[in-house]
Amino acid sequence: MDLPAHPGVLSLTTEHLLVVTSVEEEATAVLSGLTPRAADHVTVGPYAATSVRDGPSTVTVVAGGVGPPASAAAAATALALLPCSAVVNCGIGGAFPGKAPPCSIVVSDMVVAADLGAQTDDGFETLDALGFGPVTLDADTALAGACLERLVTAKLQARRGTILTVSTITGRQSRLAALASRWDPVAEAMEGYGVLLAAANFGVPAVELRTMSNVVGHRDVTTWDVTGALDALVQASRAVFASPLPQRLPWIASP
């Protein structure tokens, strides 16, 4: 079923996967896993995006910016303008100590807005504790399961777990200990909650997928492996999105 075209936006079928990254380097890695296939450079509102087609299936990749507000705005814009059937937030991230090896892949079963709340003399209170809404969002079970299954089939090192979304990256041991105790997370990044909240508001299944570039805690960028994590993101993209894409993605119900 084709939906009406929007000005400057490619008109696509309902078998349409939206991938949201934060920066262009991550978007390039995702697209590298999708080559060689026909790609169209499209405009999605104010965002430049790339759509890759495989028969009736399409993957649109957009770099929406860093942080929860930017990622939520980008995802919501794309979902308002494109007939997306599923959303994946992709990028690199940090692993909590002992939870995921360097350059391995984490697929979310839950995302948490971990620093959204109030810091008081008695400690940190989450937004839901203050009565202003949930700070946790579950990933779509079928979508997360399909992603993990494809990664494992491709013999990539991957696991599922809780991914924290933060506005300020954790670089102190005291905060690391507090977050680990509160949420038992596997990884930390800056966009997942924003993307999944936008998807939830549109009723579209979503999941976060991260490749590990560093260990959360003391901030020493000399120990990070950004290149390795981006290479792992290429492999993850190839496994999840381009195996090749079937005529109907396994997590998408018929319209």
Predicted regions and their residues:
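Glycine-rich beta-alpha junction loops
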Residues: 23, 94, 111-112, 165-168, ...
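Hydrophobic/aromatic beta-strand patches that form the interior of the parallel beta-sheet core
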Residues: 62, 88, 106, 159-164, ...
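His/Asp/Glu-rich mid-to-C-terminal helical/loop segments that flank catalytic regions of hydrolases
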Residues: 216-255
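Glycine-rich phosphate/pyrophosphate-binding loops
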Residues: 202-216
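Metabolite-binding pocket within alpha/beta catalytic cores that recognizes anionic/polar moieties
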Residues: 2-138, 145
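Short acidic/polar active-site loop segments enriched in Thr and Asp
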Residues: 85, 186, 205
